[in-house]
């Protein structure tokens, strides 16, 4: 059977294609990890805004109200 390219050239082409595919897979995996981290940060921000900040506001508000009432109780 006749070959259009030599064995060395064919091996070089195949290795180049496989290296390119490995690079593309690496980029996709990296992109997926970065997207997951961004989603995690977004969800943490939602938890912070919806749970932590209101809880801290209520805590500090009650603490201020209680600290202003303490002298009245001592009198």
UniProtKB/Swiss-Prot annotation:
Gene Ontology process terms (BP)? disruption of cellular anatomical structure in another organism; symbiont-mediated perturbation of host cell endomembrane system; viral budding from Golgi membrane
What is the annotated localization of this protein? Host Golgi apparatus membrane
Q: Where are the transmembrane segments?
A: 14-34
Q: State a GO cellular component annotated for this protein.
A: virion membrane
Q: Where is this region: Disordered?
A: 61-75
Q: Consequence of mutating residue 11 to A? A: In strain: Omicron/XBB.1.5, Omicron/EG.5.1
Ranges per topology, Intravirion: 35-75
Q: Which UniProt keywords apply?
A: Apoptosis, Host Golgi apparatus, Host membrane, Membrane, Transmembrane, Transmembrane helix
Virion surface-facing ranges: 1-13
Motif stretch (PDZ-binding)? 72-75
Q: Which GO terms describe its molecular function?
A: identical protein binding
Disulphides: none
| PROSITE patterns assigned to the protein according to its UniProt record, in alphabetical order | COV_E (PS51926)
Topology in the lipid bilayer is annotated as: Single-pass type III membrane protein
Q: What domain of life is recorded for the organism?
A: Viruses
Q: What is the effect of changing residue 71 to L?
A: Complete loss of interaction with host PARD3 and MLLT4. Partial loss of interaction with host ZO1
According to its UniProt record, which protein family does this protein belong to? Belongs to the betacoronaviruses E protein family.
Q: How does it assemble?
A: Homopentamer. Interacts via C-terminus PDM domain with PDZ domain-containing host proteins such as PALS1/MPP5, TJP1/ZO1, LNX2, PARD3, and AFDN/MLLT4. This may lead to disruption of tight junctions between epithelial cells. Interacts with membrane protein M in the budding compartment of the host cell, which is located between endoplasmic reticulum and the Golgi complex. Interacts with Nucleoprotein.
Put simply, this protein is called Envelope small membrane protein
Q: Taxonomic classification, please?
A: Viruses, Riboviria, Orthornavirae, Pisuviricota, Pisoniviricetes
The encoding gene is E
């Amino acid at each position: 059977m006749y070959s259009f390219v030599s064995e060395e050239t064919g091996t070089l082409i195949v290795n180049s294609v496989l290296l390119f595919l490995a690079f593309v897979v690496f980029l996709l995996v990296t992109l997926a990890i970065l997207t997951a981290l961004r989603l995690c940060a977004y969800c943490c921000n939602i938890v912070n805004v919806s749970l932590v900040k209101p809880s801290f506001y209520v805590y500090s508000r009650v603490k201020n109200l209680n600290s202003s009432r303490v002298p009245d109780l001592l009198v």
